[in-house]
Design a protein with these regions (language model features):
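Cyclophilin-like peptidyl-prolyl cis-trans isomerases
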Residues: 2-175
Length: 175
C-alpha cells in the first residue's frame, strides 16, 4: 500500500511539474522582431490589451507583409510610423480593425495602431513612440511595447516622408 502511494505521488508530481512548465512557456509573451535598415527592434505583443490587433499583426508578420516597407512618417520627439505598403500613409492591408482602446499609457517604446478619423479604421500601419505620448491614451489601440532596440528606433531618418527613408528589411515572430 505504501509503495502504491509513493508511485501515485511520483506520477502526480511529474504531471503537475509538466503542467507548470507548459503553462510557463505558453504564458511567455509573443515578440515581433523587426530587422530594420538601422538595426534590430524587438516588440513584446500585448494580447491582453488588443487581442484582435495582436492576431492581425501576427498574421501580417507571418505573411511577410511588412518586409521592405518604409518608415513613411517620422516626427522627432513624437513617433516613427510604418506599415503602409504604398509608403504614402494612405495604404494598408485592406482589412480594417475595430478599435480596442484601453487606459494603457503611451510611454517611450509603446507601439500603437495608426488610423484615420474613424476609430475603427486601423489596418496595418503602426507607430512607435519616441517618448511619452500620453495624449494618445484611450484614442489609439496599443498592441505592443519595445523591449529591445529603442536606440535603433531613435536613429530612423526623420521626415514625412523622410528624404532617405529607413525600412523594415524583414519582420518575424521570435522563436
Amino acid at each position: 500500500m505504501r509503495n502504491l502511494r509513493k508511485i501515485r505521488l511520483t506520477v502526480l508530481s511529474a504531471v503537475l511539474g509538466a503542467f507548470f512548465i507548459m503553462s510557463e512557456k505558453s504564458s511567455e509573451a509573443a515578440v515581433v522582431v523587426l530587422e530594420t535598415s538601422k538595426g534590430q527592434v524587438e516588440i513584446e505583443m500585448k494580447p491582453e490589451l488588443a487581442p484582435n490587433h495582436v492576431a492581425r499583426i501576427t498574421e501580417l508578420v507571418k505573411q511577410g507583409f511588412y518586409d521592405g516597407i518604409i518608415f513613411h512618417r517620422v516626427i522627432p520627439g513624437f513617433m516613427a510610423q510604418t506599415g503602409d505598403p504604398t509608403g504614402t500613409g494612405t495604404g494598408g492591408s485592406g482589412e480594417n480593425l475595430n478599435a480596442e482602446f484601453t487606459d494603457y499609457e503611451y510611454v517611450e517604446g509603446t507601439v500603437g495602431m495608426a488610423r484615420a478619423m474613424n476609430p475603427n479604421s486601423a489596418d496595418s500601419q503602426f507607430f512607435i513612440c519616441f517618448e511619452g505620448c500620453g495624449h494618445l491614451t484611450g484614442q489609439y489601440t496599443v498592441w505592443g511595447q519595445v523591449i529591445d532596440g529603442m536606440d535603433v528606433v531613435r536613429k530612423i531618418n526623420e521626415g514625412q516622408p523622410p528624404a532617405e527613408p529607413d525600412q523594415i528589411v524583414s519582420a518575424r515572430m521570435k522563436d
